UniProtKB/Swiss-Prot annotation:
UniProt-listed Gene3D superfamilies: 2.40.50.100, Nucleic acid-binding proteins, P-loop containing nucleotide triphosphate hydrolases
Taxonomic placement: Bacteria, Pseudomonadati, Pseudomonadota, Alphaproteobacteria, Hyphomicrobiales
Subcellular location: Cell inner membrane
Superkingdom to which the source organism belongs: Bacteria
Family: Belongs to the ABC transporter superfamily. sn-glycerol-3-phosphate importer (TC 3.A.1.1.3) family.
Organism listed in the record: Rhizobium etli (strain ATCC 51251 / DSM 11541 / JCM 21823 / NBRC 15573 / CFN 42)
UniProtKB keywords: ATP-binding, Cell inner membrane, Cell membrane, Membrane, Nucleotide-binding, Sugar transport, Translocase, Transport
Gene transcribed to yield this protein: ugpC2
Cellular component annotations (GO), alphabetically ordered: ATP-binding cassette (ABC) transporter complex, substrate-binding subunit-containing
Protein name: sn-glycerol-3-phosphate import ATP-binding protein UgpC 2
Function: Part of the ABC transporter complex UgpBAEC involved in sn-glycerol-3-phosphate (G3P) import. Responsible for energy coupling to the transport system.
Amino acid sequence: MAPISIRDVKKSYGKHPVVHGVDLEIQSGEFIVILGPSGCGKSTLLRMIAGLEEITGGEIAIDGRVVNQMEPRERGCAMVFQNYALYPHMTVAENIGYALKVAGVAKTERSRRIAEVAKALSLEPFLDRRPAALSGGQRQRVAMGRAMIREPKVFLFDEPLSNLDAKLRIAMRAEIRRLHRRLGATSIFVTHDQTEAMTLADRLVVMNGGRVEQVGTPEEVYHHPVSRFVAGFVGTPAMNLLEGTINDEGVFVYDQSRKIALPRERAAALKGKRVVLGMRAEAARLVVPDAPGALVATADFIEELGASRVVHADFDGLPFAVALTEAVSVKSGDPIGIAIDHNAIHLYAADTGRLIENSAMSGAGAVHA
């Protein structure tokens, strides 16, 4: 186990910056997930930690030692890649133990440690097979075993589950979490998959455009997103976002005429401001269209998710998602009313996209169509 300090780390390719001054403190034994869309710099940051990319600026320290000038093999990290990176001509046992062989570890000790790793990853029946004879999940476990056997201070995972089908991804998420509990090593996992991020992380690091948008537990990031980007990126469905203006009466006005009344004490300081109102799908519920204060819309399509459903509504071209857990009869094309939980509203500055502090609403008024 080892703490990691990332201080004002930058990366540029020529004149093109791709990582802009990232600061992050990772505790010893912590499981960190870096989440973001393609091209946000998350894999580049991971590769700089591993030593596979040069650092343009800033400093990375692992276990108290600055590693900027260290070779990858000197950093105490083991990396698991998306494409497994197994040697096709070697057996599972040979793949797992290859790093020890190169390091000159005695054959008896190699065999003992290979057996331990194979048992931990349920690979014992496959030790004499070659990668071509394995399933995708088995190959990924071999890749993990090859990292485990080195007994590293830090595990680095670069989208390791992307090539697996949905069922295998679920199984491998559980496998990785069990592995982390067993070994206790500091782990950094890069993904664009929100489900992976939310289920694996002790803390999430959400990146966008080479910058860190938010760091926090999955619960903090989901329930208290600090920017419009995080609100719209984290969560399935994404947070409902409506852009409008706070008028002189302290009412949020969007789509020219639709209105949501806000608490006077919050709206008073925001009169005349362009803001983005955000609300999770589960903070809304369906009511009859003529219910007092209901937002009138049309059910566009319904996602059936087994234990729950999501109604994707359309009102004059604006999308709005409502999560249902109770049995409600609704089908595409039905007129619906939407009631919202004003305690769950967040406001973001339209120009910067940042959360307006203390913008979680309480005691707000009705919604008017």
